Amino acid sequence: MNHAQLRRVTAESFAHYRHGLAQLLFETVHGGASVGFMADLDMQQAYAWCDGLKADIAAGSLLLWVVAEDDNVLASAQLSLCQKPNGLNRAEVQKLMVLPSARGRGLGRQLMDEVEQVAVKHKRGLLHLDTEAGSVAEAFYSALAYTRVGELPGYCATPDGRLHPTAIYFKTLGQPT
């Protein structure tokens, strides 16, 4: 068995990780995580979501990483680089997902460390994200020194259909040069 390796997914390597990303989304949603999909998510929908990422990756507006072990995707994270002329200093952290069976191994922290380092290289000194209020993810982001701004009530539905608030976080990495 190989050790888990962090890899950047490019337009060229996308096909190699497509199935693993779809499986990760499927298992994450069916594990109860609120990442934009409902409990009736099937693999066809998961593949469609994956396929929608490729154009943004090719355009350079979305950066995507996976942690893979023996070519199995265990975790992933995305960084959406704001393309607005007045927002070139910021980016949104999206879809940090870790397989339920791979949690507790530090993969989320490994991904977030990489996301932050690359954000600085892209001169994105302000990162923001949202996560389900009251979820275990809140403690995770707080431990990484993200600042909680507040909540939006009834912002999204959990996979089982209940409306739930989302918590908004940010982190300042430094001033772009």
Curated annotation (Swiss-Prot):
Q: In which domain of life is the source organism classified?
A: Bacteria
Instruction: Spell out the Pfam families in the cross-references.
Output: Acetyltransf_1
Q: Kindly report, in one word, the top-level EC class recorded for this enzyme.
A: transferase
State the InterPro entries in the record.
Acyl_CoA_acyltransferase, Bact_Acetyltransf, GNAT_dom
Ranges of residues in domain N-acetyltransferase: 4-174
Question: Where in this chain does the entry annotate a coiled-coil region?
Answer: none
What protein name is recorded for this chain? Acetyltransferase
